[in-house]
Amino acid sequence: MNRLFGRGKPKEPGPSLNDCIAGVDARATNIEEKISNLEAELRKYREQMSKMREGPAKNSVKQKALRVLKQKKAYEQQAESLRNQSFNMEQANYAAQSLKDTQATVAAMKDGVKQMKTEYKKINIDQIEDIQDDMADMFEQADEVQEALGRTYGMPEVDDDDLQAELDALGDEIALDDDTSYLDDVVKAPEAPSREPGADSIVPGKSTIETDEFGLPKIPTSLKTT
């Protein structure tokens, strides 16, 4: 049958929603341009009537202005209708796109869960627990090695009371070192002599022993002759 009558042409896909929106917006833009031109024509007629006196000429211009105004109103209704159509189609397009995005999200989530299940099958929980136990044993052995290396030998045991007594004694020694009162006698200045060296005069209140020019006691004469 196909050979006798031939195959029908494949049906072409209809315009998409975006194409319809673009077409309606273009028609609305064209009508709005016509409205703008009619407004300019109305301003021209209004200026003419403002400069004319009442009479047949002014009435003729007025009729033209009324005709242009009717056209403007008709175009405004068409433009509003087209804008409403475009808005409704945009809302429908947004809803359709949201559904597509939702489907894509769900498909991606399903694929992710499938991959997670596949990877989870490759994991052996018992093997992981064995590894953790082995690591714990190795850390414990490492601690034992460190403790053995840091062990000391030949050190006598010291009582805590003895250590405390030695610490208290050390504090007393430090306090004694800080006491400088024993230096007072050393740094004290000597008194000035009460008389000049070699003088024989006796100062009241002082010793009566005679001294020589060096301040030393003189040897009695009787002892010299002996």
UniProtKB/Swiss-Prot annotation:
Name by which UniProt lists this protein: Charged multivesicular body protein 5
Membrane-spanning segments: none
Assembly notes: Probable peripherally associated component of the endosomal sorting required for transport complex III (ESCRT-III).
Residues with Phosphothreonine modification: T226
InterPro entries: Snf7_fam (IPR005024)
Domain of life according to the entry: Eukaryota
PANTHER family per the UniProt record, alphabetical: CHARGED MULTIVESICULAR BODY PROTEIN (PTHR22761), CHARGED MULTIVESICULAR BODY PROTEIN 5 (PTHR22761:SF12)
Compartments (UniProt record): Endosome membrane
Membrane protein topology class: Peripheral membrane protein
Primary location recorded for the protein, binned into one broad class: membrane
GO cellular component: ESCRT III complex; multivesicular body
Modified residues annotated as Phosphoserine in this record: S201
Gene3D superfamilies recorded: 6.10.250.1710, ESAT-6-like
UniProt gene name: Vps60
Compositionally biased residues, Basic and acidic residues: 188-198
Functional summary from the UniProt entry: Probable peripherally associated component of the endosomal sorting required for transport complex III (ESCRT-III) which is involved in multivesicular bodies (MVBs) formation and sorting of endosomal cargo proteins into MVBs. MVBs contain intraluminal vesicles (ILVs) that are generated by invagination and scission from the limiting membrane of the endosome and are delivered to lysosomes enabling degradation of membrane proteins. Specifically down-regulates Notch signaling activity in the germarium, probably by facilitating Notch endocytosis.
Protein's UniProt keywords contain NAD: no
Disruption phenotype: Homozygous lethal. RNAi-mediated knockdown in ovarian follicle epithelium results in cell proliferation in the germarium epithelium. Stalks between adjacent egg chambers/ follicles become elongated due to increased number of cells and the linear arrangement of germline cysts is also disturbed.
Record's keyword terms, sorted: Coiled coil, Endosome, Membrane, Phosphoprotein, Protein transport, Transport
Coiled coil region boundaries: 21-93
GO biological process: endosome transport via multivesicular body sorting pathway; late endosome to vacuole transport via multivesicular body sorting pathway; protein transport; symbiont entry into host cell; vesicle budding from membrane
Region (Disordered): 188-226
Similarity remark: Belongs to the SNF7 family.
